[in-house]
């Protein structure tokens, strides 16, 4: 039975947060169940974009701090490592660590920040699609990886949590290469992300669900209080709890479908046990869930193939530029796997005929200047 602990946590106040964390970690056996004393441990937060903690796009630094404190009690060698959105270089990493609140929060703790941008090619014979991949070096060097994710919606994957967070072990713009190789949402979410998670094998996954992000996540949505911390040895089981909390059918999430397909969890979730506080107490019934490409795929599967292919191309949501907000920074152009974005005197311009609908541009725009527009015909059909 895969246990998932859910504990109420009303705020990021240190004392309030630590009290909730201690209950949660005790529920699942204590931190020493998941790491060995004196081991090398990498903490992998979600630092997808350079935003302040209160904006709800990244793992809150108080969670990182509390986990570090527990690991230091075990004399572990602790390192914070992440490959955020955009180029993977030292100056970019430093900016993310600073803006996301980690440098200030971890001041005084014997914790290292990773600035080594060396990439390691690794092999995973158990993988289905990514048997060979490049990962950031600290992941390959670590004895254990602790996965600290954020509860958010996602315009491509619909939901991002434990499994999806591990995409951040792929260095910098190599993420764009993978997106381009595996363009279909079902291929990327149901298979590739599962291959990456299988390689990393986090010993523990903890979700920051005190404040979540709804709507146009993972970076341009709205902050919404949920008031929980969640932890599990299984990121796949944890994601079922995450979906339940935001009133989302787990079967609409590609990583969940993949977890079931590869027998990592049962299709009726009977192998998952929620412990701690009653999860039903925290469900946000009106949480804003985005329309995503998977919704259109499910529609197209109901149609004859020719019509289904047309539906995929015509009514799948498309990225649209808000030129009042665009500052011509070019981050969308750098992040675009298909290389179909140019910057002119007006701002970013997307070649929609060649756009692969991965929405990396939307995800990494620092000004929320890119919106995902839903086709009106889908609303009518739906």
Q: Over which residues does each language-model region extend?
A:
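N-terminal and secondary-structure boundary signal
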Residues: 1-327, 333-338, 342-347, 352, ...
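Extended, alpha-helix-rich binding/interface surfaces that flank or overlap catalytic cores
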Residues: 356-357
